[in-house]
UniProtKB/Swiss-Prot annotation:
Function: Catalyzes the isomerization of D-erythrulose-4P to D-erythrose-4P. Involved in the degradation pathways of erythritol and D-threitol, that allow M.smegmatis to grow on these compounds as the sole carbon source.
GO molecular function: intramolecular oxidoreductase activity, interconverting aldoses and ketoses
Protein family: Belongs to the LacAB/RpiB family.
Pathway(s) per entry: Carbohydrate metabolism; erythritol degradation; Carbohydrate metabolism; D-threitol degradation
GO aspect biological process, one term: carbohydrate catabolic process
Gene: derI1
Pfam families, per the entry: LacAB_rpiB
Active-site annotation: C69
InterPro entries named among the record's database cross-references: Rib-5-P_Isoase_Actino, RpiB_LacA_LacB, RpiB_LacA_LacB_sf, SPI_LacAB/RpiB
Organism superkingdom: Bacteria
The EC number(s) this enzyme carries: 5.3.1.34
Catalytic reactions of this protein: D-erythrulose 4-phosphate = D-erythrose 4-phosphate
Stated induction or repression of this protein's expression: Up-regulated during growth on erythritol, D-threitol or L-threitol relative to growth on glycerol.
Protein name: D-erythrulose-4-phosphate isomerase 1
Lineage, broadest ranks: Bacteria, Bacillati, Actinomycetota, Actinomycetes, Mycobacteriales
Native organism: Mycolicibacterium smegmatis (strain ATCC 700084 / mc(2)155) (Mycobacterium smegmatis)
């Protein structure tokens, strides 16, 4: 499974984004890392970063995204505004696993003020190893979720 992964953060998640970006670039499962910001001296509000990342997935230009803000909540809420995107905030192994295997979530969000860096790095490594099975019992539930999205023209 070769993945194109988008990374993004606001200023409250910049340090973790940079560390995770380095880990992703060194991981053989990742073929491309796309950084949508912020830069070291930038101050872009998290909704803009999260939506930019989610749109790349929705447009087929990336497979997954890893987003960081202070809590991980704002980036998840923002990314979920993009049709077809399922973003979660998860700070434990079981939730990370189930986010992919049960919910086919493409976006994993962390809170830099909530979870330690080493745990975030470990969870990101684990997350890369999970792949949704479209023939699983969960597939019908994911389709039901998608059915609640407004039709796009």
């Amino acid at each position: 499974m070769a993945l194109r992964v988008v990374v993004g953060a606001d200023d409250a998640g910049y340090e973790y984004k940079e560390a995770l970006k380095g880990d992703l670039a060194a991981d053989d499962r990742v073929t491309e890392v796309i950084d949508v910001g912020v830069g070291a001296d930038e101050d872009t509000a998290y909704p803009h970063v999260a939506v930019a990342a989610a749109r790349l997935i929705a447009e087929g230009k990336a497979d997954r995204a890893l987003l960081v803000c202070g809590t991980g909540l704002g980036v998840a809420i923002s990314a979920n505004k993009v049709p077809g995107i399922r973003a979660v905030t998860a700070h434990d192994s079981f939730s990370v696993e189930r986010s992919v295997l049960s919910n086919n979530a493409q976006v994993l969000c962390f809170g830099q003020r909530v979870v330690g860096l080493e745990l975030a790095r470990r969870l990101a490594r684990e997350w890369l190893g999970y792949e949704f099975d479209p023939t699983s019992k969960s597939a019908e539930k994911v389709q039901a979720i998608c059915g609640y999205e407004p039709a796009t023209s």
